[in-house]
Amino acid sequence: MRRRSTEGTVMTDGSKPTFEIGIAMSGAISAGAYSAGVFDFLIQALDAWEKAKAEGAPDLPEYDVRLKALSGASAGAITAAIGVIAAGGREAPATFPSPAPGSQNIRFTLGRLYRSWVTSPTLVSPDGSPDLLSLEDLAGGRPVISVLNANVLTAIGAEALEATGTLSPRAYVASSLHLYMMLSNLRGVPYAIHFNGGQYNMMTHADRVHYVVEGIGTWKPTPSPFADTDSGTSIAATSLFGAAGASTRPPEWLAFANAALASGAFPIGLSPRVIATATSQYAKAKFPISEDQSELRPIPTWPDAWHVSASQDYPFSFVSVDGGLINNDPFEFVRFTLMKDPPRPNERNAEKADRAVIMIAPFPEGPPFLGDGEPPLGVLSIARRVVTALRQQVRFKPDQLLAVAAEGTHSRFMISPHRVPPSTPGGEEREETFSIASGLLGGFGGFVLEAFRDHDYQLGRRNCQYFLMRHLTIDKNHQTLHWPEGAAERRNAVISKTLSDGSMHDYVPIIPLVGDALPEVPYPRWARIDENAFALLVKRIEARLVAVARRLVSTETTSARMKLGLNFLLLVGRNRIVDYIRLTLLQELVMRDQIEGWPLPAADLRPDFVRAVLAALLDPAFDLRTEAGIARTTKLDTSLVREILSTLAGAAGANCQVWLAPWTRTDEPSLYTLVSRRPSFLATLLQGRSPARLFAKPVVDRK
């Protein structure tokens, strides 16, 4: 039987007080490797605590922490889904070959999760196995359904379901674990709200699937008024573990994997997925909103011909793409699942909070802030910006996120990438400009190199360790959740903080670091691609580009004349397109210091400023740059840009050597580019002359 302590904390007879957690994982594309690393270390820390309790170790907290819910969008959904399966079994942790004395020797705990995020999804496979640039998905004349070979992700999903080991439930995971995965439903679901005098019709494309995973854990969870009455599909871990071979994989788990891949189906880049469900799932669906839905909830207005009613169900299928397109931060689903009495918020005070949402957000770098006069008043530039604006707006959730940032809130936490090199004795710690290696190309960059993804996985583990030690805390004098007298001090776990009102408060970690979770996770070495690997990458991209373009021309056009014209355009424009892609890749790799062969000249200049100028010179939109144009792009002072350009001009023979156009008149601004990008002889000869209008000439940002 369950009983409540006088302070309201849910307890079980004969057990300790419980602190409940839920994890929300944001969309991240290839930076999902970071979220996976965070989850990996969290499982390691909770395992180590359970082991210490079983061994009777002293000075441990007198309460338990339990995992009740997960939610994810895009890469976050894939991480949550595979993480749940990985947590159902036990693999021996992988270790570093030569760990530093006193540092963490464990490389990863959840091998299935590591392989899914680090080993498998890559643009260029080092061993020749199928990768994201392979052409196997186009074999046999099949049509193009995505720019990249999404068969790789299908294979990852299939491998994740190969849970042939023994099911080993974890004591700190709910026996009925709620998992929400976000979907972008391209078909849409119609709704109507009735008013006096009429009705308002609308369509939602923000969809989700809700699974209740049975048997991954043994903790009998407390009731969830929101999730327990929401439409959810129960799925048993026992039906997966022990299954052997593709033919015996349970269909409900195949649907589970398909939903996770659908949530991660980035539009155009990765193939969409078809989700098969039924209208009854929507009749019971609840929304994480502040209105009470106990007696009234929105009901879809399906077509009359379907004859949908309380007793009549109807099959409903739809095409789904990236769930992060509409809801990239599914924080609210976990928050409502943890609520005792929704929509009333949980207790937030550090002395009373007994449940919390942990949000994993892999992209700490916000969207760029446009300068004056941007975007230009052109049709294409406005169209591009409208799409970006809509996407950024749906991610703007001040009502949810402001509460996370509030100083006194201890029921909502966020962990995001921070790359801070260990300081030398007496030195000052300084966070690096770029935290994750997967951040380039809008998040696709992690697929460039396995070392990029491994770096982010290890950074996730390191950041999680610091987060558990310093940020996931409660007041030392919490009403119901206590450490033994003096235990936190003996473990050197007390964190003293000065609040904005000047008062000093002592906090203790909610999850203690003990056993193999205590040694420091090593600082991962920043990963770089070598020039040969980069050249191979560009070559493989070109092969995929040409194959996809030719297949599109073949399957999407019926006119022979049109096919001939498009193939001719591909022939004459191929080199220009490939060069644009090469420069775009190189621009970001150089700016983020993620490619070898680009050492900077010795100078008293900040390296990240120098790389920003180099990136501006590599911008494929311009052939020649002015000091003012570079300053506008980099947000650096013009005098600093001039100093950097002068320094780079002296880097003879280096990739970073700058070239100054010799034809510039004294009354015009100087023009710069890299030596490797000098205009051709013809373009140089015709620059500024009227015949140049008949030929392609360099693009210059004179204004």
UniProtKB/Swiss-Prot annotation:
Residue positions of motif GXSXG: 72-76
Compartments where located: Cell membrane
Principal location class: membrane
Transmembrane segments: 23-43, 69-89, 143-163, 250-270, 357-377, 432-452, 644-664
Membrane-topology annotation of the record: Multi-pass membrane protein
Keyword Transmembrane helix annotated: yes
Motif (DGA/G): 322-324
Domain PNPLA: 23-335
Gene Ontology terms: cellular component: plasma membrane
Official protein name in the record: Uncharacterized protein y4iI
Source organism of the structure: Sinorhizobium fredii (strain NBRC 101917 / NGR234)
